[in-house]
Amino acid sequence: HEKYEGRTLEDFFISSSLNCLSAEIESNGQFMMVKRAKHAEEIIRFASMWNMDGIVVIGFCNQDYTDLRSHMRIPFVVYDGDCAHPERIVNITIDNFDGGYQVGRHFRELGHAAALCISDNAICVDRKRFQGFCAGFAPGKAELLVVPMQKEPRWEFYRAQLHRKAEYVNLHKIILLIL
């Protein structure tokens, strides 16, 4: 995904997920290869070069998963993805709405009256987290601030928004921002 700027494996969620996956795979007598890809088409080419039992895909979009499924015969699992039509796709994901709801409820119970949620987009899983947060916190009392994905434009955006920091006591990051 473009937000990783070529540093996908430095993302804490992805690296910790790979660590857990590799432990499980190895405990079952298999091994794991890791291949970064900027475009989903690269996965098809890579998969055709090896005799693989299966593949785990992270970080692409719904249309990419659908295209992959139509071009690949080996089983594959989407890890924490957003699949609108999961036919023949196994999607291992968390309940993003409920996770957001729990965080929102927790902040409300702590007595906070306003919250600023920060994300680099307002679609898919991040949208679900924000919607859950609003439902748990208080509808209309949370604002979503969408920041640029790329590092330099993001820093410029932050500098331009510094005057707003006093408006909010808590900053709830919907996603891990890679700075």
Task: Label every model-predicted segment.
Residues 1-10:
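N-terminal helix-turn-helix/winged-helix DNA-binding helices
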